[in-house]
Amino acid sequence: MRTMSWPPTTRDGAALAHAYVSLLDWPLLVDGAVVTPEQAEELMERNPSAVMQTRGEGFDTVSVPRGLGSDVLLNVDRSPVTFPSFRVGDDVVTFLVEAGTGACLADISEARIESGALVPLPPTQGLRWDTPPWDIYADGPKALKLPHARDLRKSLDTALRTHRGHS
């Protein structure tokens, strides 16, 4: 088995695949097929446009437009809670929250909440981690505890007031 570099970068597909499976215990799929980290590495090297995914069984996703998401990221930087998030191209920021909690944000029309869905992951083209779901400051691999969606609410509400005020 390849030695995983720590912490993995968005471009290091092999290290990411190992972190997803070994550290986070997420099932890994490449182009829809369940794979091992080694298979994922090989498939991504052969086809850089391949899509790496997981089943979002251990978390919910909260996706918002990029402008709103950028403001949320600024707000959460001041929070004691860490919110794993990744960018989807130039259009969307997706936050990972504790499984089953995303529904508490269902009243926010700008947010798309998904539970149990297939979730594309970096290093898929166009995706990059803003805040990965592991502690980048730890001496070794350490998964972050995903926050409850209500912990994201204050930052979302603050950002929404700003965005709706400029509409």
Please place each PLM-identified region on the residue numbering:
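Aromatic- and Lys/Arg-enriched surface recognition patch
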Residues: 102-141
